């Protein structure tokens, strides 16, 4: 249904988000409003005064898709697909992005992060370390889902606990230590804003 200007934007919804986000961010209590938005709607994280929607952050769905496609490839074929890893840099400053590897990517037969990686057992861990290192160096805030830090093998299931015993296995413990080190570097060398 066309709006009063002939477009297909829901003008009332736009005004609702602008108002809601202005009120919430105006409280100055540390509230973050994060948009999971996949349509390339412009200015999601810009202030309403700049004709933005006023969200604090936006999931970078394009980066996530490209990252996962690249990381699933056998390393011998990656040299033909580096564009998957570099394209996100062309728009990385257009919004306040969060690089998300969410629950959506480790359910419904999509595999856990470690099982998305190519290669034999040890190679999977090396590939995931390389991927996380790239992620930490890419512009945007970072968000891993539970179990991704130690190499959870099973897909996420809200009815079942994580396989915490894996964190005691050498390669899993090493991955967890590696992620801890990456996050420590991130805290030391990035601004809090």
How should these model regions be labeled?
Residues 189-193:
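Conserved small/polar residues in nucleotide/adenosyl-binding loops
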Residues 171-188:
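Catalytic cores of secreted or luminal carbohydrate-active enzymes
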Residues 2-158, 166, 174, 187:
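Conserved alpha/beta catalytic core and glycan-binding cleft of carbohydrate-active enzymes
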Residues 162:
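Active-site beta-strand/loop architecture of penicillin-binding DD-peptidases
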């Amino acid at each position: 249904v066309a709006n009063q200007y002939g477009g297909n934007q829901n003008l009332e919804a736009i005004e609702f988000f602008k108002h809601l986000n202005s009120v919430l961010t105006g409280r100055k209590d540390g509230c973050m409003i994060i948009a999971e938005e996949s349509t390339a709607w412009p200015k999601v994280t810009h202030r309403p005064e700049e004709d933005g929607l006023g969200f604090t952050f936006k999931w970078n769905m394009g980066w996530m898709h490209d990252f996962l496609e690249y990381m699933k490839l056998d390393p011998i074929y990656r040299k033909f697909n580096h564009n998957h890893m570099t394209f996100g840099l062309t728009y990385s400053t257009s919004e306040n992005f969060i690089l998300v590897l969410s629950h959506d990517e480790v359910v419904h037969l999509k595999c856990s992060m470690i099982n998305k990686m190519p290669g034999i057992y040890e190679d999977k861990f090396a590939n995931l370390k390389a991927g996380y290192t790239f992620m930490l160096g890419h512009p945007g805030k970072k968000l891993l889902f539970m179990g991704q830090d130690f190499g959870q093998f099973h897909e996420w299931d809200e009815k079942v606990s994580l396989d915490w015993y894996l964190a005691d296995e050498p390669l899993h413990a090493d991955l967890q230590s590696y992620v801890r080190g990456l996050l420590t570097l991130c805290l030391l060398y990035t601004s809090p804003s």
